[in-house]
UniProtKB/Swiss-Prot annotation:
A GO molecular-function annotation: translation elongation factor activity
Gene name in the database record: fusA
Domain of life assignment: Bacteria
One of the GO BP terms on file: ribosome disassembly
Residues holding GTP: 14-21, 82-86, 136-139
Protein name in the entry: Elongation factor G
Lineage: Bacteria, Pseudomonadati, Pseudomonadota, Gammaproteobacteria, Oceanospirillales
tr-type G domain residues: 5-279
Keyword Nucleotide-binding: yes
Subcellular location: Cytoplasm
Protein's organism: Carsonella ruddii (strain PV)
Length: 681
């Protein structure tokens, strides 16, 4: 076991193609974890181990690796998670960041801030994660460093601390200036030479070193006193940066080129020296004194991911916040009020594994043996009603129907899709009650394409699918009070359930669904509350406009009655479903469609035709800005319904010279004329 203060739980996050996996491969090589550098373009990287990742050259699932790095001040064990950059796999970033203590955000030196950069930045801010920025690809044509830093300050309103400078740019990028140690780091054929600052770089080095020291003095009174008296050391600088990073008062930024092996050692030093240990962060939102980041405290962990291994079964990825566990122990799932047994504890090295005899506070490990625990569940030894903050699951926006070519494979397909949905909470499925079709819903075309590819090739169930369809939602505009009764009398024991529900739209809260119980005086016994909730949850899966799931709705049980003999869970479940269905009919239900945030990068001469096409697609322009390379960046909001085949349209309109990225923005009311078109289909 490692000293907890030396553990670093970090993630690498960025827009797709910013170089996350390439950076991870270099980190693993320079740390001694691997003896050969994997390359994305040859499909032999350690963290992109899935066949689909290697074929496409992208990260699909977050991969965990553990390695070691020593600086002059720390000898650290680093649990590193390489996350996807593609918007379709946002859930992988979300659940990884939930359990990490620090992050490295990569930014491409030539592309700058991109849409998914904003998304992962906001995700890291949501969890108050201390971070380091690494401007990658300084060797690229069009690369910039200082101007990107200014853009970051303007975009995110943050205090950036420049800790190194580039020596040369684009093809002439040869090294960096370490502003902490005031040394030049030069790479010749991947060989590192450390030398004193040359006369050529002396003035700019002094300028930015002074800015660094003055920034630390502004936020750290202890360092200020040493700075005024000119009585500070390198250790004092590092300790001050570390303290301010952990407090989220500053964000260090460095530059390099992962592909060219330049700046990786400096980045590793920065991760270990500046990013927090589990002790520095503690256990967020838990005040129970029985739990602390200590091996002697009670066991407490969050299950943040599950994965079905073809040989080992269900792998449960957990972050341990308090205490310790060993194989063979019985643990308690606080979220579901059930017990589970740990058969094995393993540490993951991407797709390879090592058995452990013990795991303790600060660790990220995998449990084998858990059967009914899934993403977001809190685990402990005792049911003390302690629940860690859950993981936010995004709503799917696109659907396809899936059916097996061989009819006998239907049950196998159904079971497999059910397993995939447990692995990936942003993936949902339902069975069309009229046609019996399996409808699979996900975050985008690529998301569903990967799943279908795994079904066909990895599990050898050949399928046919429909064209992608938009996943609409439904909501309400009016508040309604509605009763529902389910009464049956057939000679023997009857059925009696009676509820009164108040339904109202959620206008402000972030929740998509709220259920509250406000009955008093025992008008309905407590043992029927769960059945009533089940009836409600079943009914909101099918709205009254077009049968889509209902969202942004608050439902309160306010009254009802029961029969001492005839009442049953079944009767109350049906009564709740009946009440809700009738209420939805009266509450001005309406259809919601997903709106996508689209960034288009196009040569200036095609700006007019691109904007005209956006208008035809019911889009709204947010901004049009220059990117200093004779290109225009058009940011817009466009309904997903209008974006099928957009790649072809954009290529045609710009002779193949424009490209675009998109991510989910929100759900918005569908205009009536579009609703009528959907109904006709």
């Amino acid at each position: 076991m490692n000293d907890i203060k030396n553990i670093r739980n970090i993630g690498i996050i960025a827009h797709v193609d910013a170089g996350k996996t390439t950076t991870t491969e270099r980190i693993l090589f320079f740390s001694g974890f691997s003896h050969k550098i994997g390359e994305v373009h040859t499909g032999n990287t350690i963290t992109d181990w899935m066949k689909q990742e290697q074929e496409r050259g992208i990260t699909i699932t977050s991969a965990s690796v553990t390695f070691f790095w020593k600086t002059n001040f720390y000898n650290s064990s680093i649990n590193l998670i390489d996350t996807p950059g593609h918007v379709d796999f946002t859930i992988e970033v979300e659940r990884s960041l939930r359990v990490l203590d620090g992050a490295v955000i990569l930014i491409c030196a030539s592309s700058g801030i991109q849409p998914q950069t904003e998304t992962v930045w906001n995700q890291s801010e949501k969890f108050n994660i201390p971070k380091i920025l690494f401007v990658n690809k300084l060797d690229r044509i069009g690369a910039k460093y200082l101007s990107i830093i200014e853009n970051i300050k303007k975009k995110f309103f943050c205090n950036i601390l420049i800790i190194n400078l580039n020596i040369g740019i684009e093809n002439s990028f040869s090294g960096i200036i370490d502003l902490i140690n005031m040394k030049e780091l030069i790479w010749n054929n991947s060989q590192l030479e450390i030398r004193n600052i040359t006369n050529k770089n002396f003035d700019i080095s002094n300028k930015y070193r002074n800015i660094l020291l003055e920034t630390l003095s502004e936020y750290d009174d202890i360092f200020l006193e040493k700075y005024i008296n000119s009585n500070f050391s390198i250790k004092d600088i590092i300790e001050s940066i570390r303290k301010l990073v952990i407090l989220n008062k500053i964000i260090p930024i460095a530059c390099g080129s992962s592909l060219k092996n330049k700046g990786i050692e400096f980045l590793l030093d920065s991760i270990v020296n500046f990013l927090p240990s589990p002790i520095d962060i503690g256990i967020k939102n838990v005040s129970n004194i029985n739990y602390s980041v200590n091996i002697k405290s009670k066991f407490l962990a969050l299950l943040f991911k599950v994965f079905n291994d073809p040989y080992l079964g269900l792998l449960s990825f957990i972050r341990i916040y308090s205490g310790k566990i060993e194989p063979g122990q019985i643990i308690f799932n606080n979220s579901k009020n059930i017990k589970e047994k740990i058969f094995r504890i393993i540490r993951m090295f991407a797709n390879s594994k090592k058995d452990l005899n013990i795991a303790s506070a600060g660790d990220i490990v995998v449990l084998i043996g858990l059967k009914n625990s899934f993403t977001g569940d809190t685990l402990s030894f005792d049911n003390e009603k302690v629940l860690l903050e859950k993981i936010n699951i995004p709503l799917p926006v696109i659907s396809v129907s899936v059916e097996p070519i061989v009819k006998n494979d239907y049950e196998k397909l159904l079971n497999l899709i059910n397993k995939f949905c447990k692995e990936d909470p942003s993936l949902l499925f339902k069975i069309n009650e009229n046609t019996g079709e399996l409808i699979l819903s996900g975050m985008g075309e690529l998301h569903l394409e990967i799943i279908i590819d795994r079904i066909n090739n990895e599990f050898n169930i050949k399928t046919k699918t429909s064209k992608p369809q938009v996943s609409y939602k439904e909501s309400i505009k009016k508040t309604i009070i509605q009763e529902g009764k389910y009464i049956k009398q057939t000679g023997g024991r009857g059925q009696y359930g009676h509820v009164v529900l108040k339904i109202e739209p959620i206008l402000i809260e972030k929740d998509d669904f709220i259920f509250k119980i406000e009955v008093v005086g025992g008008v309905i016994p407590k043992e029927y509350f769960l059945s009533i909730e089940k009836g409600i949850l079943e009914q909101i899966k099918c709205g009254v406009v077009l049968g889509y799931p209902v969202t942004k709705i608050k439902i309160t049980l306010i009254n009802g009655s029961f029969h001492p003999v005839d009442s049953s869970e079944y009767a109350f479940k049906n009564a709740a479903s009946i009440a809700l269905k009738e209420a939805l009919k009266k509450a001005n239900s309406f259809l919601l469609e997903p709106i996508m945030k689209v960034e288009i990068i196009s040569p200036k001469e095609y700006l007019g035709i691109v904007i005209s096409d956006i208008s035809k697609k019911r889009g709204n322009i947010i901004s049009v800005v220059d990117n200093n390379n004779n290109l225009k960046i058009i940011n817009s909001l466009i309904p997903l319904r209008e974006l099928f085949g957009y790649s072809t349209d954009l290529r045609s309109n710009t002779k193949g010279r424009a490209n675009y990225n998109m991510e989910f923005h929100n759900y918005s009311e569908t205009p009536n004329y579009i609703l009528e078109k959907i109904k006709k289909k």
